[in-house]
Design a protein with these regions (language model features):
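Conserved glycine-rich cofactor-binding loop
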Residues: 10-11
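Conserved glycine-rich Rossmann-like NAD(P)H-binding loop of the short-chain dehydrogenase/reductase
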Residues: 26-43
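Conserved NAD(P)H cofactor-binding loop of Rossmann-fold oxidoreductase domains
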Residues: 85-90
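Substrate-binding pocket helix/loop in short-chain dehydrogenase/reductase
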Residues: 93-94, 98-103
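Active-site helix of classical SDR
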Residues: 117, 151
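Residue(s) in the substrate-gating loop at a strand-loop-helix junction
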Residues: 135
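SDR active-site lid
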Residues: 168-228
């Protein structure tokens, strides 16, 4: 049995990957959709053409992670695609965001991604593909988004190294590095701080990011960087010294905070 495994499938990018692959991928027998919200997974599955295995799991919970590994061991499928989308971020100064929120980011964005990848690899064959959702935040340390950016740098670095390790097995790894995407992500991320206006102007739709990611994966590219502004940002981070750019980002944050405070005072 050939399957696609998608984490974070209940909303946002994970949901969009499931929808697009369901319409365009005919060489698999079943989709395994993983997320905490089982009811949302059922809604998504009801609109899909393929058979769907719903796994309402919290990947930060070791017992739930065991459910996934045991399901793989029991059914012994061929994992044709693994798409790791589960993750979240919290904006705000490091000391302003509760430490449990920030260790939770590391746990889900990094450890859970490692465990899912490790668990699926024994069931992958030549031409199988892995898509890891990183972020343009991986390109540069970001004041006010420090932990999230660090976790995505981890994902990008890990994906590049894993790609090299799996080359002889012909398992392809692509890291997806979008800028801001119009999803539920910012409903969580902005609990302690607001998005820079610049990020609001560079937001793109999830379907565009996913189309670009699937195209990059099918061509065995190491990265997918969607939209010209983010491609320009990526080039800038490769050409310019990091320290001045980081200082500029911090100054822009401080200016944005001043504007927000002035608006609040005028209300």
């Amino acid at each position: 049995m050939n399957i696609v495994v998608i984490t974070g499938a209940s909303s946002g990018m994970g949901r969009e990957f499931a929808m697009q692959l369901d319409r365009g991928l005919h060489s698999v027998d079943e989709f395994w959709l993983i997320a905490r919200r089982g009811s949302r997974l059922k809604e998504i599955a009801s609109g899909m053409q393929h058979t769907v295995k719903i796994l309402p799991l919290d990947l930060t919970n070791e017992a739930d992670m065991t459910v996934l590994t045991e399901s793989l061991e029991e059914e012994k499928p061929v994992v044709r695609m693994l798409i790791n989308c589960a993750g979240y971020g919290m904006m705000g100064d490091f000391t302003a965001v509760p430490i449990k929120e920030q260790t939770g980011e590391v746990d889900l964005n990094c450890r859970a991604l490692l465990e899912v990848t490790y668990g699926c690899l024994p069931y992958m064959r030549a031409k199988s593909r892995i898509i890891q959702l990183a972020s343009s935040a991986a390109f540069l340390p970001q004041p006010g988004f420090s932990v999230y950016a660090a976790t995505k740098s981890f994902v990008l670095s890990f994906s590049k190294a894993l790609r090299a390790e799996l080359k002889e097995r012909q398992i392809y790894v692509t890291a997806v590095c979008p800028g801001p995407v119009k999803t539920e992500f910012f409903e969580v991320a902005e609990h302690y701080a607001s998005t820079l206006a610049m990020k609001q102007y560079t937001m793109v739709e999830a379907d565009r990011v996913v189309k670009d990611a699937l195209r990059a994966s099918s061509k065995n590219r190491p990265m997918s960087v969607c939209s010209l502004p983010i491609q320009a940002f990526w080039a800038m981070t490769r050409l310019l010294p990091q320290d001045p750019v980081i200082c500029l980002v911090q100054k822009m944050r401080e200016k944005g905070t001043e504007v927000i405070e002035e608006e609040k005072e005028s209300e």
